[in-house]
Amino acid sequence: MAQSNIYSDMIDRYVNDETVVQNLFMTASSTTKSLLHDVIADRAANHLKSLEKKQKQKELVDVRRVLSSESLNALCALYPEFHVITSNCERGSHTMAAVCRTLETLYIKSLLPVKHTVVWDVGGNWLTHVKYASDQNVHCCCPLLDYRDAMRKQERLLSLELFARNGKEKTEEFDECYKQIKAFELQRRAALNAGTAASCNNKYCCDVFQDCAYEPEEGKMRVAMGVHSVYDMTLQDLVNGLERKGIEHFIGCFLFSPKLLLGQEEGELPFVNGRFKVKKGKIRFFFLDDTTHGYEHDLNDYLDYIKKSFVVAKCGHVYMLELFSVRGDTIFFKLYDVTEYSLSRTRLLSSLLPTRDHVFKAMPIPNTEEVIVPLYWIENGEVVVERRYLPKSLVCRGMEWLMRNKANALQYETLLNYLVSTNVSAVFNGCQVREGLKTDPWILCKLAMTLLVREEFNREKQKKILEMLRMSGSEQISLKSIFRGVFVKFFGSVSLKARVLKTVARWCGVEFGSMKYDVEVLPLYVEIEDSLCLWRKGRLEGIESYDMKDEVLRYNEKKQDVERLTRSLEQKVNDGSASDTSSKLKKVAAFAVLASNKDTPLGRFIASRSLSSVSKRSSSSDASHSGSGLSASEKVVSSEEIASPQISVSESCVEEVPPMIIPYTVKKRWADYSSDSSEDVVAGEDFMSPVSTLVLRRRLPAPPAYPDDVQEAACLEYLWYLKCKIICDFSAMYSVVCDFKDQLLHDGRCEFPKNAFFLKVGEETKWAMKRPTSQQVGHQYCVKFSENDDHMELVPVAWSKHDDEIRGIYPQGLGDGWYMFSDLTYLMNEWLIFNKLVLVYPSLPKTQLKVRLIDGVPGCGKSTWILSNCDLDRQIVLAEGREATDDLRRRFTEKGFPKKRCEERVRTVHSFMLKPLSRRFNSFHFDEALMAHAGMIYICGRMLNAREVICQGDSKQIPFINRVEQISLKYSSFNVVEREHVRKTYRCPLDIVYYLNKKKYYRGDDIVGYSKTTHSVDTKSKSSGFTSLVKLPKEPVHYLTFLQAEKEEVSKHLAGVKGATVSTVHEAQGKTFERVNLVRLKMTDNELYPGGAKSEPYTIVGLTRHTRSLVYYSVVEDRLYEDISALKDVMEDQLLKCSFSEQTKXRFGSKFESIVVADRKVMAPDVGDLVTIQDLYDRTFPGNSTLDSSFDGYTVASSDLELEISNCKIAPNKSIRGFQEKICFSPKLRTAMPEKRQGSFAESILALRKRNMACPRLQESVNEHQIIEDTIAKAFSCYFTDSFVDQSPLITDESALRWWEKQSTTAKNQMLADWRTLDQIDVCTYNFMIKNDVKPKLDLTPQSEYAALQTVVYPEKIVNGLFGPVIKEINERVLSALKPNVFVNTRMTSEELSRTAEYLYPGDEFEVVEIDFSKYDKSKTSLHIRMVIKLYEQFGLNGYMKYLWEKSQTQTVVKDRNYGVEAYILYQQKSGNCDTYGSNTYSSMFALLDCLPMEKAVYSIFGGDDSLILFPKGTIINDPCGRLASLWNFDCKSMKFRVPAFCGKFLIPVGGRYRFEPDPMKLITKLGNKTIAIEGKTKAEVRKNGSKLLSEIYVSICDNYKNYDDARVLDALAYALVDRYKPDICPKAALYSLSKFLKSFESFTELFDIYFNGERLAFDFVPVKVRKDYEW
């Protein structure tokens, strides 16, 4: 189930995408939903709820601007600290920049303290603080530096008035701020008019920050912030202002592009849709969607915030600047006072010396897919240079092209032509000659000049380097060379004059050498360094302390509340032993500490009531029973009682309620009782006395004195058993209530015994600790108990119902008090029945009851027998289970009996005992009687005064189970007078019938099955990943467990899974399910587990509940696991022998299946040589062995090709692999076996041209709809059995998991790594590749034709993950519905194929039809595609999946990503699709069905484009090729041979039956393969790898040609070769020779030679394993 978890994680990743959720919304109202749709919808809903819950915990920020969903998602990702939403109610200029400014302000404020703090917002928008944070002390410095600033101020004043006059409610703080601002503006304007200094306002001022006159009150912390406000302020002025105001912490942000550090003068700010531009020492910022005035700032002052790290203020304080976050186009920085470090270094000497410090930082550079290229042109007669950012791929392509050419081929025009051709998306005759980003064409001419000059210079430079390396590498050393080397080492190789000239050139800005045309790759980062040299040191001032008296006061109040509550509880403890009082007090005090947490509703309640609870007293102890819920009332209690508060909690807080502390008399636990004299335990009583409603601990009564009458003894034992069972249940109820009152049950998050729930009824009715769901209530009784004593009593319960469904979780009609509900009180039928029986039993007639038993196997139709043989006018029917009773009632009603009579006389046994009939009956029926106690049946007979009971049951299934382990029963089984065996089953699949017969569980005749299902079982254990419960798949099927504990665990595991049900094996007896998962979770042995002492009936019941499939999940590979594993391998023909239809209706040749035919091999003679084999090949295919094709692949790869091709694009700039030579075996046989090709661009184009682009066009006018309808209808009469056609939902967890388990690890990893959602997957795009292995030709065409490689068109792995499980399920359904004489080759070996033809009698003659199709995959048209989809519809495909599948098969794009080929294909079968083999097979079946009388076929087998059909001799068969061409577009030919063949295997009669044996000519051709490559560089490696490779080939050949040692097979094959290939000699000698070389590995190695450095190597056999599909 690790796979299942991996598949589940994949779905969770899908629902993270917004588009998936949108698609789910669009399909929410669809009526054709799939199970996969429901699963994803549920996951998406849970995911959205989780996101919503997390978002609600964040600060909500409404940015108000109109934003797209993409922009809003980008903001949420950029600022995850906030819950960003937009009401889309505003539209303005530079929207993203404005929204980002709001979020940046909130983000910076979240990093600064607010309480008892003054915040200077440098250049901030004071209006924002006034409107939304008027209670915070924020002062904004908004200087008027130009007219633009004055205009912004007027905008803010207008917005203030608009906000103030909108008529909505306002806070008092805002009103005060508004009045203050209005007064300040009047004073300021008056001062400006008078020419005097303006006054200051605590909300804002119009001065620069360094001149701000605002002084807050003392005792508050001072911090500052700046949001896009430092552009016009030098860093020095900023720190001077901070120093003057005593501010030690400043956090700000500004726009920045890292490309400024690279000298770029203009660029974009993509996130805010803006740009920057450097012009004359200034930097400008502007926005593309904004027409307002832009901003211009000093560039050097701006860059100081990036480059500087230390700044010394005017009075010596040192501030350190750090860039700490980059979000979008905004960079955040911190400016903190770090003077403390400089002062800490003051020493006697160091105080006179400066402090020096050095730091560095790395600025990351985005978009490194570009390079900087110098471009040149002439302007006004001068060469002008410009450095431009260009795509790295384009520049590298040009450089690589120059490197591939010789010096004399380096021409400007050629290079320019290449750059243009690779830059323009032009298709000429289907060939595209560019791939990559498009560059402006006027840049290409400049780029070509730069690259050409660069290449010429680099080549000259490389020549000099080579010369110098050759000279320095000389082994001859002279004194002159030594002196030259020493001189160069110390003075360099460049002369002093040259170095001086280069220095002067740099000073003058003159470029020279490689500086002119170097292509610069963008760095990953820019390193910035800064240092500090400090003489003067500032002074440190302390930060004002914060008064936390309010927080301390709240903590002390909480502590005092706890102490006060504890003291009040101490006063309520009466006299008693010190130890008892202490222990009780500790328990109560601990609860008080827990409950006094004021963060919970209960804590707040106790804290508020703890003072008043001390003063409240009640006058009598009766007040505690009134249900008023007093918090801490005083009571008069005995020495064994304690007092504790009763807590009243509202229903909404029920999950947070700690355990109740209920005052009651403390009693001893059950384990303390050691004698029967205990007053708390009722002594053993007469088993015939009724059980009252009091819930007590009772002892079990003694067993009755059994009389000699067996039936009477059974009746008494049954009554005794009921009494014991009731006493045990009552004792369990008593214990649960005591555990609750003793606080042993204290955590509602944990499970309660017997699924108990506790209800308090009073002024407020509430569930304690946890509340049930509506599905968990419906109890018929509950236990009422008191708070102060041990009185417990059963009381009936009523519930509010509507249409028999419970509508609420609170019962009706209960008085005040405590109530316990549990599984034991749900029905209480046994208690009611017992009390009823003990009253009426003495008066019942003691008549003897005759027992007649219909002993039938599972699914034999016992209920149907009752329906046919019961007369409800004279008999009644009793049954054990409610479901079986309801089913019988329904069927009797359908038969015509009145509904009232059916309800009266078809009853459950419990219903009958509680409400018996007054009328007497002579006989009655009892369904599943063996599950009941014999005494129950006898009592029912006496209550009916009956003489005979007709019982239905299975003696091998689970009998009556004693639920009271403390007692032993002797008379639970009844004596059968008449027994009738039924050995037929309508339910069980044939493999289960086969298993039951094989195990001999049932005596007498073998069981016969009527089911059409053959293989239905599967196993999962450690070897397949099932190791624990977490690996159990969650599927909508029925789960069976052996134990009740396992049932509970599985139920929890499957909670919420729609359609999943769970029961024990015992509970499932008599029931039927379509799909079953049988589960064993315990590794330890148990008597019920397979192999245990009582396991047989459980095994039978567990295996016989399903009709379609059973999967056994076991953590232990026990006996049942081994049996089922072996059962999976049983052949279908063996299973069919258990079928009733096979015994009444003869299958083809079934009359011969009981005949044992002696089939012994006749060993072939050990004679022959290679010459004989070679002679046969040369005479069969003359001229093929003389052909040398060794250099064909190289010639094609290295020569020019001239092809006409259309509907494709070609990227010729893809890398081309060189032709490689490898060490290969040298075969001694010379055949036309094509060499293994090496992939290349030419091979890919050839394969595409000769295969996918050469489709037949033979189809005439066709009425597709009519042909499809008629053919499908005919197919279901000729090919399929209607009753086996399955149209249930295709997409299930089970089918997806089975498909997933078959995938390779690589494929799984690829699918898990693909995070695309369904709307992002292009199902119409396929990958294209070529197979390196060439299919051998068994004709003369290799002499004149260069065979094109086979092409593979395959989708992406994620597309296979979408369609694969569906197609796999459809194929399985199709195969299971085929008729017995129709077969599909599903990777069958020769032996498996031979089994399909076993029923054919070799003496019969047949009309054989073999059709050879050409270009089969490529011949597919819309007729084939829709025909196959129509078939898929009949087996469950529908809805959106059907549409996607049809779309993926119509117009498709195939891409060869290795060699840059892209083609466009209409229809065709994609050879790498998940349904390729199945679709090809079905197309062949339908086409031949339309052209041939398939209803007369005796035997037909299909596999892809291969088919073999046998008709009775004399059947008139017209040549179908004409209709196949004109109607089905197939280019084919009909072949007539005496010996038929299928998939390269001849159907030959050997040993009295037909066999499929592989074609020997195909093997001989393969033995001439000259390209069996061996990896290795040394002799030992070549020998080792060669031995392994030859061993694999030999093992594969022996598996496929194992019968070649039989002379009878070789003789029959010799006849087949003469019939098919027409050699002019008898092939027997060559076949005997071939058999000789296959008998041993040593003989097989004689077929090949290999030489290493002239030495022939010998090879040893290495034991290897090969795959089943590995065929050589």
Swiss-Prot record:
It catalyses: RNA(n) + a ribonucleoside 5'-triphosphate = RNA(n+1) + diphosphate; ATP + H2O = ADP + phosphate + H(+). Its EC number is 2.1.1.-, 2.7.7.-, 2.7.7.48, 3.6.4.13. Residues 853-1113 are annotated as: Helicase. Keywords: ATP-binding, Coiled coil, Helicase, Hydrolase, Methyltransferase, Nucleotide-binding, Nucleotidyltransferase, RNA-binding, RNA-directed RNA polymerase, Transferase, Viral RNA replication. InterPro entries: (+)RNA_virus_helicase_core_dom, Alphavirus-like_MT_dom, DNA/RNA_pol_sf, P-loop_NTPase, RNA-dep_RNA_pol_alsuvir, RNA-dir_pol_PSvirus, Virgaviridae_RdRp, Virgavirus_MeTrfase_C. Residues 547-575 form a coiled coil. Residues 823-982 form the (+)RNA virus helicase ATP-binding domain. PROSITE patterns: ALPHAVIRUS_MT, PSRV_HELICASE, RDRP_SSRNA_POS. Pfam families: RdRP_2 (PF00978), Viral_helicase1 (PF01443), Vmethyltransf (PF01660), Vmethyltransf_C (PF08456). One of its GO terms (biological process) is viral RNA genome replication. Residues 64-801 are annotated as: Methyltransferase. GO terms for molecular function: ATP binding; ATP hydrolysis activity; mRNA methyltransferase activity; RNA binding; RNA helicase activity; RNA-directed RNA polymerase activity. Residues 85-306 form the Alphavirus-like MT domain. Residues 1406-1519 form the RdRp catalytic domain. Residues 983-1145 form the (+)RNA virus helicase C-terminal domain. ATP binds at G856, V857, P858, G859, C860, G861, K862, S863. The replicase large subunit is translated as a fusion protein by episodic readthrough of a termination codon. When readthrough of the terminator codon TGA occurs between the codons for 1145-Lys and 1147-Arg, this results in the addition of the RdRp region. Belongs to the ssRNA positive-strand viruses RNA-directed RNA polymerase family. Heterodimer of a large and a small subunit. This is Replicase large subunit. The lineage of its organism: Viruses, Riboviria, Orthornavirae, Kitrinoviricota, Alsuviricetes. The gene is rep.
